Amino acid sequence: MIKPIKILGVPVHPFTMQESVDWLEEKILAKQQTFVVTANAEIIMMCQEDASYNNIISKQADLVLPDGAGAVWAGRHLGYNVPERVAGFDLYCNLLALSAKKGYKAYFFGGSPGIAEAAKAKAETMYPNVNVVGCHNGYFTVADEAGI
Protein backbone atom coordinates (compact mmCIF):
# COMPACT_ATOMS: atom_id res chain seq x y z
CA MET A 1 0.00 0.00 0.00
CA ILE A 2 1.21 3.48 -0.80
CA LYS A 3 2.15 5.26 2.42
CA PRO A 4 0.08 8.30 3.34
CA ILE A 5 1.51 11.78 3.14
CA LYS A 6 0.78 14.40 5.80
CA ILE A 7 -1.14 17.57 4.99
CA LEU A 8 -1.30 19.71 8.13
CA GLY A 9 -0.84 16.51 10.10
CA VAL A 10 -3.69 14.68 8.37
CA PRO A 11 -2.67 11.44 6.64
CA VAL A 12 -3.73 11.49 2.97
CA HIS A 13 -3.15 8.57 0.62
CA PRO A 14 -1.95 9.85 -2.77
CA PHE A 15 -3.81 7.22 -4.80
CA THR A 16 -5.19 7.51 -8.30
CA MET A 17 -8.86 6.72 -8.80
CA GLN A 18 -7.97 3.28 -10.15
CA GLU A 19 -5.62 2.55 -7.24
CA SER A 20 -8.43 3.54 -4.86
CA VAL A 21 -10.93 1.25 -6.58
CA ASP A 22 -8.42 -1.63 -6.66
CA TRP A 23 -7.56 -1.17 -2.97
CA LEU A 24 -11.23 -1.10 -2.02
CA GLU A 25 -11.97 -4.17 -4.13
CA GLU A 26 -9.33 -6.04 -2.11
CA LYS A 27 -11.23 -5.05 1.04
CA ILE A 28 -14.54 -6.15 -0.53
CA LEU A 29 -13.10 -9.54 -1.42
CA ALA A 30 -11.65 -9.91 2.08
CA LYS A 31 -15.05 -8.89 3.54
CA GLN A 32 -13.18 -6.29 5.56
CA GLN A 33 -15.16 -3.35 6.91
CA THR A 34 -13.38 -0.22 5.73
CA PHE A 35 -13.73 3.46 6.69
CA VAL A 36 -12.92 5.76 3.76
CA VAL A 37 -12.74 9.55 3.89
CA THR A 38 -12.55 11.72 0.81
CA ALA A 39 -10.88 14.76 2.33
CA ASN A 40 -11.16 18.16 0.75
CA ALA A 41 -9.49 21.30 2.12
CA GLU A 42 -12.46 22.00 4.40
CA ILE A 43 -12.15 18.58 6.07
CA ILE A 44 -8.39 19.02 6.51
CA MET A 45 -8.93 22.48 8.05
CA MET A 46 -11.70 21.15 10.32
CA CYS A 47 -9.15 18.65 11.65
CA GLN A 48 -7.04 21.64 12.76
CA GLU A 49 -9.94 23.12 14.71
CA ASP A 50 -11.58 20.05 16.26
CA ALA A 51 -9.45 17.43 18.03
CA SER A 52 -12.27 14.85 18.10
CA TYR A 53 -12.87 15.23 14.38
CA ASN A 54 -9.13 15.01 13.74
CA ASN A 55 -8.98 11.79 15.73
CA ILE A 56 -11.75 10.26 13.64
CA ILE A 57 -10.09 11.20 10.35
CA SER A 58 -6.43 10.71 11.29
CA LYS A 59 -6.65 7.68 13.56
CA GLN A 60 -9.80 5.76 12.63
CA ALA A 61 -10.05 6.08 8.84
CA ASP A 62 -8.49 3.24 6.87
CA LEU A 63 -8.10 5.35 3.74
CA VAL A 64 -8.09 9.15 3.36
CA LEU A 65 -8.17 10.33 -0.24
CA PRO A 66 -7.50 13.81 -1.68
CA ASP A 67 -10.95 15.04 -2.71
CA GLY A 68 -10.52 18.53 -4.01
CA ALA A 69 -8.07 20.77 -5.79
CA GLY A 70 -6.96 22.27 -2.46
CA ALA A 71 -5.89 18.91 -1.04
CA VAL A 72 -4.07 17.99 -4.25
CA TRP A 73 -2.39 21.42 -4.43
CA ALA A 74 -1.32 21.28 -0.77
CA GLY A 75 0.23 17.84 -1.21
CA ARG A 76 2.10 18.91 -4.32
CA HIS A 77 3.17 22.19 -2.70
CA LEU A 78 4.68 20.15 0.14
CA GLY A 79 6.70 18.19 -2.44
CA TYR A 80 4.63 15.02 -2.60
CA ASN A 81 3.53 13.23 -5.75
CA VAL A 82 -0.26 13.52 -5.56
CA PRO A 83 -1.37 12.17 -8.94
CA GLU A 84 -4.99 13.32 -8.99
CA ARG A 85 -8.11 14.29 -7.13
CA VAL A 86 -10.25 11.35 -6.02
CA ALA A 87 -13.70 12.79 -5.49
CA GLY A 88 -16.05 10.83 -3.26
CA PHE A 89 -18.93 10.96 -5.74
CA ASP A 90 -16.74 9.76 -8.60
CA LEU A 91 -15.24 7.03 -6.43
CA TYR A 92 -18.69 5.77 -5.47
CA CYS A 93 -19.79 5.77 -9.12
CA ASN A 94 -16.72 3.70 -9.99
CA LEU A 95 -17.51 1.31 -7.14
CA LEU A 96 -21.14 1.00 -8.27
CA ALA A 97 -19.97 0.16 -11.80
CA LEU A 98 -17.58 -2.44 -10.38
CA SER A 99 -20.35 -3.83 -8.18
CA ALA A 100 -22.71 -4.12 -11.14
CA LYS A 101 -20.03 -5.92 -13.15
CA LYS A 102 -18.88 -8.31 -10.42
CA GLY A 103 -22.03 -8.79 -8.34
CA TYR A 104 -20.85 -7.00 -5.21
CA LYS A 105 -23.49 -5.56 -2.89
CA ALA A 106 -24.09 -1.85 -2.32
CA TYR A 107 -25.89 0.00 0.47
CA PHE A 108 -26.87 3.67 0.70
CA PHE A 109 -26.70 5.24 4.14
CA GLY A 110 -27.07 8.82 5.28
CA GLY A 111 -28.70 12.10 4.40
CA SER A 112 -32.15 13.43 5.06
CA PRO A 113 -35.18 11.12 4.80
CA GLY A 114 -35.72 10.21 1.15
CA ILE A 115 -32.17 10.96 -0.03
CA ALA A 116 -30.78 7.42 0.32
CA GLU A 117 -33.88 6.03 -1.41
CA ALA A 118 -33.47 8.50 -4.28
CA ALA A 119 -29.77 7.60 -4.58
CA LYS A 120 -30.69 3.90 -4.68
CA ALA A 121 -33.23 4.50 -7.45
CA LYS A 122 -30.72 6.58 -9.45
CA ALA A 123 -27.99 3.94 -9.03
CA GLU A 124 -30.33 1.20 -10.21
CA THR A 125 -31.14 3.28 -13.30
CA MET A 126 -27.51 4.12 -14.07
CA TYR A 127 -26.15 0.64 -13.28
CA PRO A 128 -28.94 -1.86 -14.14
CA ASN A 129 -27.09 -4.88 -12.72
CA VAL A 130 -26.15 -3.25 -9.41
CA ASN A 131 -27.32 -5.12 -6.30
CA VAL A 132 -28.40 -2.45 -3.82
CA VAL A 133 -29.32 -4.44 -0.73
CA GLY A 134 -30.76 -1.55 1.23
CA CYS A 135 -30.73 2.06 2.24
CA HIS A 136 -31.40 4.17 5.31
CA ASN A 137 -31.35 7.88 6.04
CA GLY A 138 -28.86 9.33 8.48
CA TYR A 139 -31.35 9.59 11.34
CA PHE A 140 -31.66 6.61 13.64
CA THR A 141 -31.81 5.55 17.26
CA VAL A 142 -29.64 3.08 19.15
CA ALA A 143 -32.49 0.58 18.78
CA ASP A 144 -32.29 0.94 14.98
CA GLU A 145 -28.55 0.17 14.80
CA ALA A 146 -28.82 -3.63 14.67
CA GLY A 147 -31.14 -3.47 11.67
CA ILE A 148 -28.93 -1.04 9.82
Sequence positions of predicted segments:
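N-terminal nucleotide/polyanion-binding subdomain common to many enzyme families
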Residues: 1-85, 89
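Conserved beta-alpha
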Residues: 75-148
